[in-house]
Amino acid sequence: MNVTVLTKPDCVQCDFTKTHFDKHGIEYDVVDITVDADARQKAIDLGYFSAPVVIVEADGQVAHWSGFKPDRIKALGAEAGEQQ
């Protein structure tokens, strides 16, 4: 499973999202959309205009959402635990 969190500086929901991923032992990459134009465009192409945007690639499928979603992060943590 590959997880990418598109973030921006001074983003409380971004910080909560990263903290929750850490809490559930999920590894993720962080990309700052204020300095990476391609990442910013990817978020826009997915239909999002606010951070964080989380992109999860697993088993050939891609899931994504915007905002702090602790229930989805917890479910990913449980799923990752099953795969180990």
Model-predicted segments: where are they?
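Local sequence-structure signature of Cys/Sec-based thiol-disulfide redox active-site neighborhoods
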Residues: 1-24
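Short polar/charged helix/loop
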Residues: 23, 38-42
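Acidic/polar helix N-cap motif
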Residues: 35-36, 69
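Short amphipathic alpha-helix with an adjacent loop that forms part of the alpha/beta core around
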Residues: 41-46, 75-79
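Structural micro-motif
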Residues: 46-55
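Non-catalytic, surface beta->alpha helical segment in thiol-disulfide oxidoreductase systems
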Residues: 58-83
